[in-house]
Design a protein with these regions (language model features):
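General small-molecule cofactor/ligand-binding pocket signal
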Residues: 78, 118-120, 185-189, 265
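Glycine-rich loop(s) and the adjacent beta-strand/alpha-helix scaffold that form part
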Residues: 30, 128, 137-228, 233, ...
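FAD-dependent oxidoreductase catalytic-site/capping-region signature
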Residues: 28, 34-83, 90-91, 210-213, ...
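Periplasmic solute-binding protein
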Residues: 1-15, 172
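Classical protein tyrosine phosphatase
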Residues: 23-26, 163-189, 322-327, 418-426, ...
């Protein structure tokens, strides 16, 4: 739901790596094309697109306290993280419409599927059909048997960061050593398939609240929860109209970085064992490293398409990533210790007030850190030896196949990947139209 495009320098960096036509000025029209912005038209926003983007319908007392504390620590208030600059603290924008979640399925599919398309569901795609250097179709199966769908022009892979490289490898397209280790015949050697996995690493500081103003209070009290639900149903405001993650502040983790590389997110709730809400009022301040050094991998587990791939994130493998996580956690703590935020803190639950050294904080990062599920990069766009697709999203060395999803990002964007993934879909669709219809 959170809609943060990233920084202009992210996309200019793509172009600098050889991804022609993917600089910020080139991708901005596709961000605008997809958007139906509640605020209306401006230099950075548009209306009439399929994706509804809105502000949170009500301000929260904890969000206001978070902004004020962040301001005292040097982060100015930012009314629009998708505007001129990402620097500062403010409320996030979300993909909602009338205070309800608005997905890309809502915007692009419902009531809009053309009559000249057949959608097949509940099937497993097993492999691509590769004939004389060209992808000519896909093999798929369901409970009744195995079939082949033939392509007269090209096959578009949009299986996501985990399954797009998996499908290529199942088809014999990838690193020779990986394929041969799984007894898959090499059809087209491409070293970068499944490499370059990137994600945002998050680590939280968790607090018991001194006042009953968090989402936990709604889950732990039937009357409060019921009243909040009625408020939402009648007026589309209140905590049920928000996603629980009210606010962000974007900061530099150190003086060595020239633009924000940490996203600190205020979450108006906290969880305990098995991610169940704690039985008391609490909140979390999550530090997220948004430009990581580490690179992971996604590779097939076997030649059986029904098996899930092997995913290795390699979080905290570099000194830079360790330092950023520690500094981000320290900043989250500083926000909680700064008025007016400090007035809502009864006790630090995690890491705990006794954890003060960098070594202790790093151990907390290792034991409590998590993936933010912003996974990208495993079919990297570019011109180097580990790139998988070119700037037109066509797989290197093959005809008749493109990859159009978040896996093509050469480097992860500095924010939630939702908006950038939608932009890639829009730009990729236009490339297909340009190549076949013009």
């Amino acid at each position: 739901m959170i809609y943060v495009r990233g920084q202009a320098a992210d996309f200019d960096g793509w172009e600098a790596q050889g991804c022609e036509g993917w600089g910020f000025n080139s991708v901005m029209p596709y961000f605008l094309k997809c958007e139906d912005q509640e605020r209306g038209v401006s230099q950075y926003h548009a209306v009439g697109g399929p994706v509804s983007v809105a502000d949170l319908p009500s301000k929260e007392i904890l969000g206001e306290a978070f902004h004020e504390a962040s301001k005292k620590l040097g982060s100015p208030y930012n009314n629009d993280f998708n505007g001129e600059s990402q620097v500062g603290a403010g409320y996030v924008q979300v993909t909602t419409k009338n205070a309800r979640c608005w997905s890309t399925a809502d915007g692009y599919l419902k009531g809009k599927i053309a009559t000249n398309i057949t959608v097949v569901t509940h099937v497993m795609v097993n492999s691509l059909v590769l004939e004389r250097g060209q992808i000519t179709g896909v093999n798929y199966s369901d409970k009744s048997g195995t079939y082949t769908a033939r392509a007269t022009k090209e096959v578009i892979i949009s299986a996501g960061t985990f399954n797009s490289p998996k499908l290529l490898e199942l088809s014999g397209i990838g690193n020779r050593e990986v394929l041969e280790s799984k007894d898959i015949a090499v059809q087209h050697e491409l070293r970068g398939v499944g490499e370059n996995l990137q994600d945002h690493f998050g680590i939280g500081a968790q607090y018991r609240a001194s006042k009953p103003v968090t989402v936990n209070d709604l889950s732990n009290n039937v009357i409060k929860g019921g009243l909040a639900l009625m408020r939402y149903l009648l007026f589309k405001t209140g905590p049920f109209a928000n996603n629980g993650n009210y606010s962000n502040t974007f900061i530099n983790s150190s003086q060595d970085v020239d633009r924000p590389d940490m996203m600190i997110t205020f979450m108006g709730w906290c969880t305990g064992e098995n991610l169940r809400p704690r039985p008391f009022s609490g909140f979390t301040i999550l530090a997220e490293h948004i430009r990581p050094d580490c690179r992971g991998t996604v590779h097939v587990r076997s030649d059986d398409p029904r098996e899930q791939p092997i995913i290795k994130f390699n979080f905290l493998e570099s000194d830079a990533d360790k330092k950023a996580a520690i500094e981000g956690l320290k900043h989250a703590r500083k926000i909680a210790q700064t008025a007016p935020m400090s007035g809502f803190v009864a006790e630090e639950l995690k890491p705990g007030s006794d954890k003060v050294t960098d070594e202790q904080l790093l151990e907390h990062c290792r034991s409590e850190g998590l993936s933010l599920l912003h996974c990208v990069g495993t079919c990297k766009m570019g011109v180097d030896e580990l790139s998988v697709v070119d700037s037109r999203l066509k797989v290197h060395g093959l005809k008749g196949v493109r990859v159009i999803d978040a896996s093509i990002m050469p480097t992860i964007v500095s924010g939630n990947t939702n908006a950038a993934a939608i932009m890639i879909g829009e730009k990729g669709a236009q490339m297909v139209i340009d190549d076949w219809c013009n």
